[in-house]
Amino acid sequence: MKVIETKYNGKLEVAEDRLIAFDQGIPAFEDEKEFVLLPFEEGTPYYTLQSTKTVDLAFIIVNPFSFFPEYRVKLPEATIVQLNITNENDVAIFSLLTVKEPFSETTVNLQAPIVINANKQMGKQLVLGDTAYDRKQPLFQKELVLAKEAK
């Protein structure tokens, strides 16, 4: 067990097998190499991706397919190799939220999903270069906003 201080839940004991390694960090947070996935609030679709090193670094994330069933992510071969993915059922995809006031104006980044190999506890943020998905998609808007034409 590892004791970590969290932004939203105070001090927690976390099993070592729940720690997720981000070997390259997350863009703009390259020194942050270890996170834990926690429910933000029971009964909601929101999670926290909490740094185990920096208390105040906690991203609010969601499963984008819960809000946008037509959303698609094709993993590049390099990501499959980097995360040691051998079974597609081991892959979990999350998207970062930008929480706004009022909450109904919150946006989700569909252009750079968080990809986690749940079996190996390895993750990365994948920037989709050839996508029309927006990085500021309104979370509660049912239609996807296409930022640009896909290449």
UniProtKB/Swiss-Prot annotation:
InterPro entries per record: Flagellar_assembly_factor_FliW, Flagellar_assmbl_FliW_dom_sf
Single GO biological process annotation from the record: bacterial-type flagellum assembly
Subcellular location: Cytoplasm
Alphabetized Gene3D superfamilies for the sequence: BH3618-like
Highest rank taxon of the organism: Bacteria
Keyword Cytoplasm tagged: yes
Keyword annotations of the record: Bacterial flagellum biogenesis, Chaperone, Cytoplasm, Translation regulation
Annotated GO CC locations: cytoplasm
Family: Belongs to the FliW family.
Task performed by this protein: Acts as an anti-CsrA protein, binds CsrA and prevents it from repressing translation of its target genes, one of which is flagellin. Binds to flagellin and participates in the assembly of the flagellum.
NCBIfam families: PRK13285.1-1
Assembly notes: Interacts with translational regulator CsrA and flagellin(s).
Protein name according to UniProt: Flagellar assembly factor FliW
Name of encoding gene: fliW
